[in-house]
Every structure is written in C-alpha cells, then in structure tokens.
Amino acid sequence: DIVLAQSPASLTVSLGQRATISCRASQSVSTSGYSYMHWYQQKPGQPPKLLIKYASNLESGVPARFSGSGSGTDFTLNIHPVEEEDDAAYYCQHSWEIPLTFGAGTKL
C-alpha cells in the first residue's frame, strides 16, 4: 500500500497569512502529466470536502486562495490568505491504486 506522510500534524497561522501543508508518498503517484493526488478539508461533524484534485485542479466552488502543487512523491497544499472559516483538518489522498489511502491529516 502507498503510505502518505503529511506534515505538519498541526499548524497555527494568523488570519491573512499563508498555510502550507506537505504530503509525501512512499512511491510516485504521477504519470504522463497526471498526478493522482487530491486534497480534502474536513470540519467536525461533516464529511470530507474535496478541495483540489489531481494535485493542482481546484474543485468547482472552492475559493482560489486554495492551491495545490507537486508531482512524483512530493505535494503541497497552500492556503493564502487564511480565513477564519478555514479552521479544519486537511488530508491528502491518492488514487494511484487500490487501496486508496489518506494522510494522517493536518489540523489548522
């Protein structure tokens, strides 16, 4: 199984500043220009919400202050500027193979 190592586990950022979350896969999840890495936001009592698919593609309706980058094994989620409503847990997830696995999460 592919292991996703997320860092940091928790992150405190002042409103208006930048939050950066990293995700490292135990093997490459990229091929032919596609990276099979996705980012989710989860608030207490709610299901995960897809923010970014295929490393850098913003899901419809998600604010442009969320952005993703990376390829191969190393990926990053950036939030800038951070707003109060961004208080949540963030998870990376790959879809390279079955089983799909998630990172352990980052609490913002």
UniProtKB/Swiss-Prot annotation:
Q: Name one Pfam family in it.
A: V-set
Where is region (Framework-2) located?
39-53
| Family annotation (SUPFAM superfamilies) | Immunoglobulin
Complementarity-determining-1: region residues: 24-38
Q: Where is this region: Framework-4?
A: 102-108
| GO annotation, cellular component aspect | immunoglobulin complex
Tell me the segments the record calls region Complementarity-determining-3: 93-101
Q: List the SMART domains hit by this protein, alphabetically.
A: IG, IGv
Keywords, sorted A to Z: Adaptive immunity, Disulfide bond, Immunity, Immunoglobulin
Q: Where is this region: Framework-3?
A: 61-92
Q: Which InterPro entries match?
A: Ig-like_dom, Ig-like_dom_sf, Ig-like_fold, Ig_sub, Ig_V-set, IgV_Light_Chain
Spans annotated as Complementarity-determining-2 = 54-60
Region annotation (Framework-1) ranges = 1-23
Question: Which pairs of Cys residues are joined through disulfide bonds in the record?
Answer: C23-C92
Single GO BP term: immune response
In terms of Gene3D superfamilies, this protein maps to: Immunoglobulins (2.60.40.10)
Tell me the PANTHER family matching this sequence: IMMUNOGLOBULIN LIGHT CHAIN
- Its protein name is Ig kappa chain V-III region PC 2154
